[in-house]
Amino acid sequence: MHIERLDFENSPYLGVYGFATDRVAVIREGLGEKKLATLREVLKVPLIETSVMKSRIVGIFVAGNSNALIVPWYIWDAELDFINAQLREYGIDMEVVPFQSRLTAFGNLILANDKGALVSKDFTREEARKIEDILGVPVERGVIADYTAVGSVGVVTNKGGLVHPEATDEELEWLSDLFKVDVYVGTANMGVPFVGSCMIANSYGVVVGHLTTGPEIVKIEEALGFLG
């Protein structure tokens, strides 16, 4: 099973509440065991259930790739300690970096895989260079379909990418070159263009909001490399 519909307390915006890499997934607290089991089965990585500043919208705040996770500088010490302890328990050697910036919604503002990263043009060039050092991949600043919240309007793994349907052909070519995967346009949750907010994905699988239609699922499967 590489794709599954799911809701988090009737919300179809799964990407707001979680984030996944090919090594670990960070998920909001308070989900039932049945949904956690589905996440484990689909994403095939350990789950860390946590909060950021006691907020459950951890997908808004956390970004990264297989090399590192970036979290807001104001994350509580207890939360940071818990994430690091969980990584150690799972035997995962991954840095978790509280990043100093006036921007904090990193899940909305950073789109990354293990080949490259796109960060919002709202980051300074110096911040982009620091993010490049943390994630260990080339970083570019920019927008997708005129949106600065590149993590909200896109999802990318090491197998493929899906972005806002208004992205241009030139943007798709640029993103494919940056991430070294094919990137398509599409929607989720019955026409929502903010695909990054609608799903949690890695190279092993993807969980999508429960409102996502059959045709949307086919497109998501194609874009993220699960067909053929």
Curated annotation (Swiss-Prot):
Origin: domain of life: Archaea
Function (record text): Binds to the 50S ribosomal subunit and prevents its association with the 30S ribosomal subunit to form the 70S initiation complex.
Gene this protein is translated from: eif6
GO process terms (BP): cytosolic ribosome assembly
Alphabetical keyword list: Initiation factor, Protein biosynthesis
InterPro entries: eIF6 (IPR002769)
Molecular function in Gene Ontology: ribosome binding; translation initiation factor activity
Coiled-coil positions: none
SMART domains xref list: eIF6
Pfam families reported in the protein's UniProt record: eIF-6
Record PANTHER family: TRANSLATION INITIATION FACTOR 6 (PTHR10784)
Sequence similarity: Belongs to the eIF-6 family.
Name the UniProt record assigns to this protein: Translation initiation factor 6
